[in-house]
Design a protein with these regions (language model features):
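Generic short beta-strand segments
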Residues: 16, 93-100
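Short, low-complexity N-terminal intrinsically disordered segments enriched in polar/charged residues
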Residues: 1-36
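Short beta-strand edge/turn micro-motifs at domain boundaries
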Residues: 91, 103, 108-136
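Hydrophobic/aromatic beta-strand elements that line small-molecule binding cavities or substrate pockets
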Residues: 78-83, 96-98, 112-119
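A solvent-exposed, acidic/Ser-Thr-rich amphipathic alpha-helical stretch
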Residues: 27-86
Length: 136
């Protein structure tokens, strides 16, 4: 498998892990995608128009999103992907749409994930950092 194919499989697994009907997610799948020390950051704009960010480790992300996933059908569908590689690092721009089912006509929101990966000597490609922003 090429580097691009390996990275693509990681991104596909990340989307599959968080997508599904209301209920629990299988967080053990994070090890297939992320390094243990990975960071994830959600960004938004507050009511006064100021940029905001919440940075989380893997456990923090689980705790932050589990109540939402338990109560809501949620499917994040990738709409575009660009992979840039240099040596043992890679960057992926991954556009997405959030929906209540994979083929729902109504899109709840769109955005982009900025994903940085590192080629680990034992694990292969894994996500080291990820930040996302929704369209406004």
């Amino acid at each position: 498998m090429t580097d691009e194919e390996q990275i693509g499989a990681i991104i596909d697994e990340m989307y599959a892990m968080i997508s599904g009907p209301a209920g629990p997610r299988d967080w053990s799948r994070q090890a297939n995608c992320f390094l243990p020390e990975a960071r994830q950051a959600r960004t938004w704009v507050d009511d006064e128009g100021r940029p905001q960010m919440l940075a989380m480790g893997l456990d923090d992300y689980q705790a932050n999103t589990t109540p939402f996933f338990m109560a809501n059908d949620f499917y994040e569908v990738e709409t575009s992907r660009r992979i840039d590689l240099f040596g043992n690092i890679a960057h992926v721009w991954s556009g997405y749409e959030a929906r209540t089912s994979p083929d729902a006509a109504d899109v709840e929101r769109r955005g982009i994930n900025s994903i940085q990966l590192f080629r680990h000597a034992d694990l292969g490609w894994r996500i080291l950092a990820m930040v996302w922003d929704n369209e406004r």
